[in-house]
Amino acid sequence: MKEKISKKEYNALIRKTGEKHFDGEKEEYGDGTVGLWTYELRKYKLKPPVKVKYVTQEEFGEFKDATNQRLTKIENALVAQGEQIRAQGEQLSQLIKVVLLQGEQIKSQGEQIKS
């Protein structure tokens, strides 16, 4: 796995393997690197530093607003599902009461038939 290095380390490595160590022939390697100094980078499994893309406050604000809207939609959907589940639970409890009453009625009818 390749590791990122700081710009300072990258420049030091290039200085260390500068022009006096470069043989002038461009050797291409399988990973797309060219030249001797890139061999050093590959040898130590280092990656050149990547340029960081900075965002403006406005872009960040837009991203934040979009994320908040998405989260609000998800929250509203979950609240609606919770209400549905609560209503179904109440219906189930009513059905259980009805079934228990019917069970008692059947029991009493069975006792009447036996006697």
Curated annotation (Swiss-Prot):
Q: Which Gene3D superfamilies match?
A: 6.10.250.40
Signal sequence residues: none
Q: Which InterPro entries match?
A: DUF16
Coiled-coil zones: none
Family listed: Belongs to the UPF0134 family.
Protein name, per record:
UPF0134 protein MPN_283
Q: What is the lineage of its organism?
A: Bacteria, Bacillati, Mycoplasmatota, Mycoplasmoidales, Mycoplasmoidaceae
